[in-house]
From Swiss-Prot:
Gene name as annotated: nqrA
Organism: Histophilus somni (strain 2336) (Haemophilus somnus)
Catalytic activity: a ubiquinone + n Na(+)(in) + NADH + H(+) = a ubiquinol + n Na(+)(out) + NAD(+)
EC number: 7.2.1.1
Ion transport keyword on record: yes
GO annotation terms (biological process): sodium ion transport
Record GO terms (molecular function): oxidoreductase activity, acting on NAD(P)H, quinone or similar compound as acceptor
Role played: NQR complex catalyzes the reduction of ubiquinone-1 to ubiquinol by two successive reactions, coupled with the transport of Na(+) ions from the cytoplasm to the periplasm. NqrA to NqrE are probably involved in the second step, the conversion of ubisemiquinone to ubiquinol.
Listed name of the protein: Na(+)-translocating NADH-quinone reductase subunit A
InterPro entries: NqrA, NQRA_2nd, NqrA_C_domain, NQRA_N
Class of this enzyme: translocase
Similarity section: Belongs to the NqrA family.
Amino acid sequence: MITIKKGLDLPIAGKPEQVIHNGNAVKEVALLGEEYVGMRPSMKVREGDVVKKGQVLFEDKKNPGIVFTAPASGTVTAINRGAKRVLQSVVIKVEGNEQITFTQYNEDELKKLTSEQVRQNLQSSGLWTALRTRPFSKVPASDAVPSSIFVNAMDTNPLSANPEIVLKEHWQDFTDGLTVLSRLHEGKLHLCKAGDSNIPTIDLPNLAVHDFSGPHPAGLSGTHIHFIDPVSATKSVWYLNYQDVIAIGKLFTTGEIYTDRVVSLAGPQVKNPRLIRTQLGANLSHLTENELSAGENRVISGSVLSGNTAIGPYNYLGRYALQVSVIAEGREKEFLGWIMPGKNKFSITRTVLGHFSSKLFNFTSAVNGGHRAMVPIGAYERVVPLDIIPTLLLRDLASGDTDSAQALGCLELDEEDLALCTFVCPGKNEYGPMLRAALDKIEKEG
């Protein structure tokens, strides 16, 4: 058992009921291009094309053989692009049930798969994109070999679903997926789960099971990798979430891609917070219809700490998102708010009365202050359990000193690993974009 002591479980209202319900009907789905770091698409479809589920929509020019497939059958209604023609989203109006099938194996054959067979099926189906590398959080190259693979079967994000509830419906598919991943390479396959959970395992020669406990970020893959198999400039690992392991198991046993998702629909502005069954890339306006309290709301694909605002061409459930979080837009100004006792405000420091309360808070998007310089008062050290010096690292990220940032461990991190630092920052700094800029520069220049 690895126990995390530093961190923060955000006391946010609107926690979901841990029972799975059917969500609203999905009429539109999309793939979001900007989720795939460094990807340059070569489009294989046009607006108006009719596509089958599993059909290739685009391929990565930088990574030949890595394809991105349709999560549903229907008609391509929009290919949205932003500045410099960056791909924002490929939108499909869901129609029919036609799909492309892939190679199918029985239970005995799974244990004898070769690495080449696993790669071929994952890459041709588009499920290879479930894997991400650390460092850089990119889809791995088609011929890359990791030091190890991490399966994340726990979630400590605010308002998250309990993976054990989701996995109960798919025990066999999950263990089949683990078997397939164990055949992908000869290194270790690390299954990380909560210490008090009852997650199924299977007897595999290279499978190692690890228990974690403690506050968020105990459930992040970056935390698991840091304590078990740290990365460097010359060493990489891959990671994926438990629902993608289910999808991999189903792909190899049925020959069909599985795009169902169970996500938590939760937050202070959700009328009935609960777990809902929906589809990868679902339109979040449709999914949240008649589910939200009145007023101006911010719908987030992912966690309230590190998710993406679902608006315009990005109004869809992300490829790696297991949550839909909803908070109110905090546009109101509070007169002399800095001098008030703040019994309805939360802070990690003892500056408001809410710090001493055990109640849940209706957080909004308001940052309660303007941008200012970093103030090293020990807030970052309280929420970062990794063996790094957060204040110095964040200073280097803010100043663009990538050499020092690399020496201090930035290659181990992803945006979600610094989300708590952003939340507790007295200077209202956004450290995720700073980290991404540093990682891009390091990858390009070394």
